[in-house]
């Protein structure tokens, strides 16, 4: 299985390439550029670096956020632009689900996932011990942090 996965939902760009079920490229970098100016180029260069042709990709995974609406739309457009002409499956994923599933299974307490949005703004979601959501993904400012702890689950 060959998979191209990338995330344009935050200022931290991430890309991973799985080739023959092995991770051959995994990069995360904070970028001070607009995704629309470099995304297709960096995706193509990453495939070249991994010695993988786009036609050999079985699936493209793209982040659906939460995060920058514009960044998410650019990522989806790039995934479609690369995937549709080659009939590649395109799947979206939620960053909160990725985060909660990275928590050690030994932890038997509720988990709050938090993703930075802009300067002092964040997204969060509360999950139970079975990693099921107790709340919807919500937005808060750091200035309202005390109110966050009043949420009933």
Which residues does each PLM region occupy?
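Surface "functional belts" at beta-alpha junctions
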Residues: 89-91, 96-153
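Glycine/Thr-rich phosphate-binding loops of Rossmann-like dinucleotide-binding domains
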Residues: 14, 70, 121
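N-terminal beta-alpha supersecondary unit
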Residues: 1-64
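DPxDG-like acidic metal-binding loop motif
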Residues: 59-95
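Short, glycine/charged-enriched secondary-structure capping and boundary segments
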Residues: 18-19, 74-77, 106, 126-129
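Short glycine-rich anion-binding loops that position phosphate/pyrophosphate groups of nucleotides
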Residues: 11, 65-66, 117-120
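Short, basic/glycine-rich phosphate-binding loops at helix/coil junctions
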Residues: 22-23, 77-83, 121-127
